UniProtKB/Swiss-Prot annotation:
Enzyme kind, highest EC tier: transferase
DNA repair listed as a keyword: no
This protein's name: Putative protein adenylyltransferase MJ0435
The enzyme's E.C. designation: 2.7.7.108
Species of provenance: Methanocaldococcus jannaschii (strain ATCC 43067 / DSM 2661 / JAL-1 / JCM 10045 / NBRC 100440)
Length: 93
């Protein structure tokens, strides 16, 4: 599965869950993914979303993609990793 296939599959789910902004980072963004690679996604929700909403989003993304998905919010990126992650991120929304 390439990054364009991932985008096509996840955009409707992201919109359904109230995501305002999203990017893919990590091995898929660098085109270095392996069969065992997870998919790393950054999201920014609209107002009023909780940790439970993040868990629901992660679960639905994993169901559709058939792979493990790590979902982070832009605000939760560790400061020491932030520049590297944002530089390699590929925008989805």
């Amino acid at each position: 599965m390439n990054i364009n296939e991932i985008k096509r599959k996840i955009i409707p789910i992201l919109l359904k869950h109230g995501v305002k902004r999203a990017s893919i980072f990590g091995s898929y963004a660098r085109n270095e993914q392996k069969e065992t690679s997870d998919i790393d996604i950054l999201v920014e929700f609209g107002e009023g979303k909780s940790l439970l909403d993040l868990v629901r989003l992660k679960y639905e993304l994993e169901e559709v993609l058939g792979k493990e998905v790590d979902v982070l919010t832009y605000n939760s990126i560790h400061p020491l990793l932030k520049d590297r992650i944002l530089n390699e991120a590929v925008d989805v929304l």
